[in-house]
From Swiss-Prot:
Subunit structure: Monomer.
Catalyzed chemical reaction(s): Preferential cleavage of bonds with hydrophobic residues at P1, P2 and P3' and a small residue at P1' in substrates of 5 to 15 residues
Main location as per UniProt: cytoplasm
Record-annotated active site: 474
Source organism per UniProt: Mus musculus
Protein's UniProt name: Thimet oligopeptidase
UniProt family annotation: Belongs to the peptidase M3 family.
PANTHER family: PROTEASE M3 THIMET OLIGOPEPTIDASE-RELATED, THIMET OLIGOPEPTIDASE
Annotated positions of the Phosphoserine modification: 16, 172
Length: 687
C-alpha cells in the first residue's frame, strides 16, 4: 500500500472505483501494523485539519460534510485491517501489535471527535444550508454530527472539553484492556475421567491431556457450557463455575471500578444526571427510568414462573442426590443451574441433548442455514475457494442479489476456538457498505467469529441446539451488515439504535424452533438419516422450558449494568450477588466476581444490556405478525423484511422501520406469550 499524494481525502489504497473490491488484507506483520497505524493517523488528521482551517465563507457541502463522510469510509476500512487481528490472529505478536494499534487509534478517535474547529464549521454549514436542500440521509448525517459534537461537549468551555477528552482517552484504553484480559486468559482445570462423569465420549476425547494424565478443561465456551450442563459430579461443576466467574478477577475488577467512575464524571461534565441517561438519550428507551420500569415490570411478571421452575429443580436435585448417594442441602447453587435446567429439558420434555447434537454436524447446519437465508432474503452465496484470510479454518463467501446478480457483499466464517481468539460469538463489520468518494457503492464485508466445538479425528463438529441458535443469531447480524444500502458509513449495517440492534438477528433465531427449517439443517452425522419427527417436536415444545429463570437472569445482568451506571459507588460483585438473590433466587458463588468477566460492560453495551430484552419485544412482534401469519419461509415476507428492516441500516429511525414492516406501532403481546406469560386484555404499546 502506497500512501496517496499530499493530503487526499482517500486514505491508503482507497481510490479504486470498482465497487466489488475487498480492500481488506490479513497478511500484515506486527511492524507493518505499527507503521500503517501512524500513516493512517497522519492522513486522516490531514483531512480534519483542512476542514477545520476553512474560512467560514468557504464552508460548503463538498468541502465539509462530504469530505468528512469520505474520510470516514476509508478510515473505517483501514482501521479494521489494523485492529481486527487482535481478536482473531493466531500469532501473539500480531495480536499485541493490533491491540496497540487499537489503543493509538482510539486515542486518535477521541482527538478527532473533540475538534471544535471542525464542529464550528459543521454548525455553520447547517445554519447556512436552506431547509430541505439536502437529501434526507445527508441531512440526517449533518444533524448527527452536530448531536455528537454536543455529546462530546464541544459547546462547553475549553477547560471542560479538555477534561472530557482526557477521560474519553482513558476509557478507550481501559475497555481494550478489559476484553484483552478475558481473550488472553488460558486458565484450565485438570480433572480425571471419573470427575467428568456424565460427559459424552466425543467431548472427553477432544480434551488435551495434562502432564499427570488428567484431562484439561479450559474456561472457553465449548468446554464450560457442556460440562455445566452434563457433568453429574457437583464438585467438578462447582470448581469450574467458580473459576469461570473469577477470570481476570483482580485486574478487571480494578478496571471496572475506574470505568464506572470515569463514565459518571464525563456524563456529569456534559450535564447528565447519570451515565445511563447520557447513553440512553440516543436509544429508543431515552431514559434510565424507562429502562428501570421495563425491567421491573417484566421481573414481576416472571417471578411466579421462576418460583415454579426453582421448585421443579429442587425436586430434581433431591432425586439426583438420593440416586447418587450425595447429601441434599435443600438449596440451588450457581453451579446447579445449568445442570438441572438441562435435566428439565431431558426429563420433562424428553429432549436428549446428546442425541440431538448427533443430527447437527457443522457442515449440514451450515449448508441448511445458508440455504434458508438465501431463499428468505433473495440472495446467492458462493464460497471463494482459496481466499486469503487470517487462519486456515476461515472461509470467505461472496453474496449476490439473486434477482439482479449484483454482488452486494462478502462474509468470513471463523467458527472454531483458538488460543488468544475472541471468546464469544459475534459479528464484526469490516468494510461498510456505503457510497465511496467517487459515488460508486463500496462492497460490504463482515466476519462472523464464533467458538463452536471443533471436529476431532473420530467425529465432525457436532453442535448443541443452543449453538445452532447462536449461529442463526450472529449470521442475522452478518445479513444486516451486507443488506443495508445506506449512503453514509455512519449509517451502514448495524449502526442503528443500540436497543434495536439485536432485534433483526433475534427474530431470525425463531427459525431454529420451527420444524421445516430444522429439517433442512439436520442430518445424522454417521448414518445420514433425517432427525426423527418426535425428537424435533419435543425440542420445539421445550422452547419455554426454564423461560422464567433464563429471562430473570437476563434481567439480573441488565440491572447490574444499570446500577453500575446510575449509582457510581455501587460495588459490582455485591450488586450482582444482591440481584441474583432478589430476582433469580439463586445466590452468586461466594468469592466470585461475575461483573469482572462481563465483556459487555467494556464492549459498547454500557448501560445497554437491557437492549437484548427490549429488542426482543420487536423481534417477536415482527416474527409473529408477519412470518408466522404469512409463512415462516415466505420469500415475499423475507424480501419485505430485507427492504424495510435491513436495507435502511441506520438511515431511518427504528420506530419508522418497524411501523413500515408491521403496518402499525409495535406491541408487547407476542413477546410476553413467548415467555410463557398471559396477555391480559389489550397489552400496552411496546416499551
Amino acid at each position: 500500500m502506497k500512501p496517496p499524494a499530499a493530503c487526499a481525502g482517500d486514505v491508503v489504497d482507497a481510490a479504486s472505483p470498482a465497487s466489488t473490491v475487498n480492500h481488506l488484507r490479513w497478511d500484515l506483520s506486527a511492524q507493518q501494523i505499527r507503521a500503517l497505524t501512524t500513516q493512517l493517523i497522519e492522513q486522516t488528521k490531514c483531512v480534519y485539519d483542512r476542514v477545520g482551517a476553512q474560512n467560514f465563507e468557504d464552508v460548503s457541502y463538498e468541502s465539509t460534510l462530504k469530505a468528512l463522510a469520505d474520510v470516514e469510509v476509508t478510515y473505517t476500512v483501514q482501521r479494521n485491517i489494523l485492529d481486527f487481528p487482535q481478536h482473531v490472529s493466531p500469532c501473539k505478536d500480531i495480536r499485541a501489535a493490533s491491540t496497540e494499534a487499537d489503543k493509538k487509534l482510539s486515542e486518535f478517535d477521541v482527538e478527532m471527535s473533540m475538534r471544535q474547529d471542525v464542529y464550528q464549521r459543521v454548525v455553520w454549514l447547517q445554519e447556512k444550508t436552506p431547509k430541505n436542500s439536502l437529501k434526507p440521509e445527508a441531512a440526517r448525517y449533518l444533524e448527527r454530527l452536530i448531536k455528537l459534537g454536543r455529546r462530546n461537549g464541544l459547546h462547553l468551555p475549553q477547560d471542560t472539553q479538555e477534561k472530557i477528552k482526557n477521560i474519553k482517552k482513558r476509557l478507550s484504553l481501559l475497555c481494550i484492556d478489559f476484553n484483552k484480559n478475558l481473550n488472553e486468559d488460558t486458565t484450565f482445570l485438570p480433572f480425571t475421567r471419573e470427575e467428568l462423569g456424565g460427559l459424552p465420549e466425543d467431548f472427553l476425547s477432544s480434551l488435551e491431556k495434562a502432564e499427570d494424565g488428567k484431562l484439561k478443561v479450559t474456561l472457553k465456551y465449548p468446554h464450560y457450557f457442556p460440562l455445566l450442563k452434563k457433568c453429574h459430579v457437583p464438585e467438578t461443576r462447582r470448581l469450574l463455575e467458580e473459576a469461570f466467574n473469577c477470570r481476570c478477577k483482580e485486574e478487571n475488577c480494578a478496571i471496572l471500578k475506574e470505568l464506572v467512575s470515569l463514565r459518571a464524571q464525563k456524563s456529569s461534565l456534559l450535564g447528565f444526571h447519570t451515565h445511563a441517561d447520557y447513553v440512553l438519550e440516543m436509544n429508543m428507551a431515552k431514559t434510565s427510568q424507562t429502562v428501570a420500569t421495563f425491567l421491573d415490570e417484566l421481573a414481576q411478571k416472571l417471578k411466579p414462573l421462576g418460583e415454579q421452575e426453582r421448585a421443579v429443580i429442587l425436586e430434581l436435585k433431591e432425586a439426583e442426590c438420593a440416586k447418587r448417594g450425595l447429601p441434599f442441602d435443600g438449596r440451588i447453587h450457581a453451579w446447579d443451574m445449568r445442570y438441572y435446567m438441562n435435566q428439565v429439558e431431558e426429563t420433562r420434555y424428553r429432549v436428549d441433548q446428546n442425541l440431538l447434537k448427533e443430527y447437527f454436524p457443522m457442515q449440514v447446519v451450515t449448508r441448511g442455514l445458508l440455504a434458508i437465508y438465501q431463499e428468505l432474503l433473495g440472495l446467492t452465496f458462493t464460497l471463494e475457494e482459496g481466499a486469503a484470510a487470517w487462519h486456515e479454518d476461515v472461509r470467505l463467501y461472496s453474496v449476490r442479489d439473486a434477482a439482479s446478480g449484483e454482488e452486494i457483499g462478502k462474509f468470513y466464517l471463523d467458527l472454531y476456538p483458538r488460543e488468544g481468539k475472541y471468546g464469544h460469538a459475534a459479528c464484526f463489520g469490516l468494510q461498510p457498505g456505503c457510497l465511496r468518494q467517487d459515488g460508486s457503492r463500496q462492497l460490504a464485508v463482515a466476519a462472523m467469529v464464533a467458538n463452536f466445538t471443533k471436529p476431532t479425528p473420530d467425529a465432525p463438529s457436532l453442535l448443541q441446539h443452543d449453538e445452532v441458535e447462536t449461529y442463526f443469531h450472529e449470521f442475522g447480524h452478518v445479513m444486516h451488515q451486507l443488506c443495508s444500502q445506506a449512503e453514509f458509513a455512519m449509517f451502514s449495517g448495524t449502526h442503528v439504535e443500540r436497543d434495536f440492534v439485536e432485534a433483526p438477528s433475534q427474530m431470525l433465531e425463531n427459525w431454529v424452533w420451527e420444524k421445516e427449517p430444522l429439517m433442512r439443517m439436520s442430518q445424522h452425522y454417521r448414518t445420514g438419516s433425517e432427525a426423527p419427527q418426535d425428537l424435533l417436536e419435543k425440542l420445539i415444545k421445550s422452547r419455554q422450558a426454564n423461560a422464567g429463570l433464563f429471562n430473570l437472569r437476563q434481567i439480573v445482568l441488565a440491572k447490574v449494568d444499570q446500577v453500575l451506571h446510575t449509582q457510581t459507588d455501587a460495588d459490582p460483585a455485591e450488586e450482582y450477588a444482591r440481584l441474583c438473590q432478589e430476582i433469580l433466587g439463586v445466590p452468586a458463588t461466594p468469592g466470585t466476581n461475575m461483573p469482572a468477566t462481563f465483556g459487555h460492560l467494556a464492549g459498547g453495551y454500557d448501560a445497554q444490556y437491557y437492549g437484548y430484552l427490549w429488542s426482543e419485544v420487536y423481534s417477536m412482534d415482527m416474527f409473529h405478525t408477519r412470518f408466522k401469519q404469512e409463512g415462516v419461509l415466505s420469500p415475499k415476507v423475507g424480501m419485505d423484511y430485507r427492504t424495510s428492516i435491513l436495507r435502511p441500516g441506520g438511515s431511518e429511525d427504528a420506530s419508522a422501520m418497524l411501523k413500515q414492516f408491521l403496518g402499525r406501532d409495535p406491541k408487547q403481546d407476542a413477546f410476553l406469550l413467548s415467555k410463557g406469560l398471559q396477555v391480559e386484555g389489550s397489552e400496552a404499546p411496546a416499551c
